[in-house]
């Protein structure tokens, strides 16, 4: 790992006179174009060549900024992270690395970043950016590069199940690059202290429905300087069955036998492959649960607060493995005491009630509700359009300095629109409370484990999950909302306003 310190960012910005365009209202593409045409200091070239020789692998170019890692209010996933393949032509690799660094610098000034600054009362020209160059963990499969396993580990579990304790933490595991996890993809959620209790694989039907079907890999053939605002421009989105030919599933997959309707641990020729990590979690091929327990213990101990850790792991055919800690950041767990007995408030007095909620404090100044139109026949096909409507409405709230309650089915902030509405944090940054609703035909795990979720908790935004499928999952009194006149209404979204402020506890 190599760090380019903030003084290089300062020199780059000043010597190329980039602040006028960076702080303007120019589009993200226009800002990136100016940054890519600018020059990095020549003094870095020799160091970069030395780094190439030392790593001889693909490189991740990550942001590490002053505000991003603040203990009191950390950002997560707002700035760009690029990856470049390893090339034998060192000068071509140097060009790609330079473009990636400039792309990370440019992302500080994109529209989403500026909206984020506004929402968090930070001043963008006070931001300082360091860049981390890190060897990408993984194996080379010819045209693609990815690790056996990536994960996000949180030492605080806001949704413990059964005999799990909140302080025992939760890990989200996936095949392939970790970008899939932080983008909100379908992962396997497991508590390191209870590796045998995985809800998603507890029943055959759940395992078939709720396990990973896609994964991300670095495209080793994508060579050139055509960098885009989307930092995933050279990331391949593959199906799990594509990994079968790479023979990378040996210790992390199970096979569904359609004739006997059972799931067998291991990879067999016939039947759908399911990413269950059973050989790792239940059969001890590698001591992953123990490693995760140790990582949480020392990570939280060093930061003196709960932490979120990104990690990756390669598992070899001889059952050896290499485990890498990639990033660690604090989880803001602000708490405020509530004296009122919420259970004593009758349901008839409530617009919505959740038995799984996160947040703190009492809010008594919100009068607006923005909600996705849904019923028991809801289809996720239109979630892209929903995201556009909500981003536009959110901009109006930001301009007016007001907040709202946001309600919708599925997982907010997922990059997979089948799992929920694919908004980014700045697109809903004026929301005071965010509600995820599980429906009969659309029952998705909550957002915990994504950068999006981390930002909700950091900024004290109320986060409620409501499961309409169980009598104990809470409720949304949607009939009240549907009967109200709309302040604004689109094909997919309604905005209504109450005469008096709601009381949010």
What name fits each language-model region?
Residues 439-485:
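Polybasic, proline/glycine-rich intrinsically disordered low-complexity segments
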Residues 1-24, 28-42:
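A conserved helix-loop-beta module that forms one wall/lid of the active-site cleft
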């Amino acid at each position: 790992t190599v760090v380019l310190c903030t003084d290089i960012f300062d020199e780059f910005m000043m010597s190329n006179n980039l602040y006028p365009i960076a702080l303007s209202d120019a589009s993200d593409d226009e800002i990136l174009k100016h940054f890519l045409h600018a020059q990095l200091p020549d003094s870095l070239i020799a160091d970069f060549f030395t780094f190439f020789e030392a790593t001889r692998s693909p490189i991740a170019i990550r942001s590490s900024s002053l505000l991003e890692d603040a203990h009191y209010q950390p950002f997560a996933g707002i700035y760009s992270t690029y990856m470049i393949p390893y090339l034998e032509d060192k000068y071509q690799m140097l060009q790609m690395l330079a473009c990636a660094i400039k792309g990370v610098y440019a992302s500080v000034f994109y529209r989403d970043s500026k909206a984020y600054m506004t929402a968090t009362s930070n001043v963008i020209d006070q931001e300082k950016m360091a860049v981390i160059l890190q060897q990408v963990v993984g194996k080379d499969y010819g045209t693609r590069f990815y690790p056996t396993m990536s994960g996000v580990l949180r030492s605080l579990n806001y949704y413990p199940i059964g005999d799990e304790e909140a302080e025992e933490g939760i890990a989200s595991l996936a095949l392939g690059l970790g970008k899939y996890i932080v983008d909100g993809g379908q992962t396997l959620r497991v508590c390191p202290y209870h590796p045998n209790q995985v809800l998603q694989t507890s029943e055959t039907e759940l395992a078939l429905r709720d396990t990973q079907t896609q994964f991300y890999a670095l495209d080793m053939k994508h060579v050139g300087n055509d960098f885009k605002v989307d930092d995933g421009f050279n990331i391949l989105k593959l199906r799990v069955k594509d990994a079968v030919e790479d023979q990378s599933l040996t210790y992390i997959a199970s096979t569904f036998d359609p004739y006997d309707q059972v799931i067998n641990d291991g990879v067999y020729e016939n039947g759908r492959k399911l990413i269950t990590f059973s050989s790792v979690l239940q059969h001890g091929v590698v001591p992953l649960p123990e490693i995760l327990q140790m990582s949480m213990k020392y990570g939280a101990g060093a930061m003196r607060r709960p932490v979120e850790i990104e990690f990756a792991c390669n598992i070899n055919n001889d059952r050896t493995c290499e485990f890498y800690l990639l990033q660690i950041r604090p989880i803001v767990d602000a708490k405020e005491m509530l004296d009122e007995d919420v259970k004593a408030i009758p349901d008839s007095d409530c617009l919505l009630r959740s038995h799984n909620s996160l947040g703190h404090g009492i809010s008594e100044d919100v009068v607006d509700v923005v909600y996705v139109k849904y019923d028991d026949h809801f289809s996720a096909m239109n979630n892209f359009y929903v995201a556009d409507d909500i981003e536009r409405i959110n901009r109006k709230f930001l301009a007016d300095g007001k907040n709202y309650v946001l309600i919708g089915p599925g997982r907010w902030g997922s990059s997979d629109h089948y799992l929920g509405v694919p908004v980014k944090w700045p697109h809903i940054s004026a929301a005071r409370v965010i509600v995820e609703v599980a429906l009969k035909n659309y029952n998705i795990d909550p957002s915990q484990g994504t950068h999006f979720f981390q930002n909700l908790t950091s900024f004290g935004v109320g986060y409620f999950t409501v499961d309409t499928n169980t009598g104990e999952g809470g409720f949304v009194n949607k009939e009240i909302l549907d009967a109200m006149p709309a302040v604004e209404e689109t094909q997919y979204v309604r905005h209504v306003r109450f005469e008096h402020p709601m009381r949010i506890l």
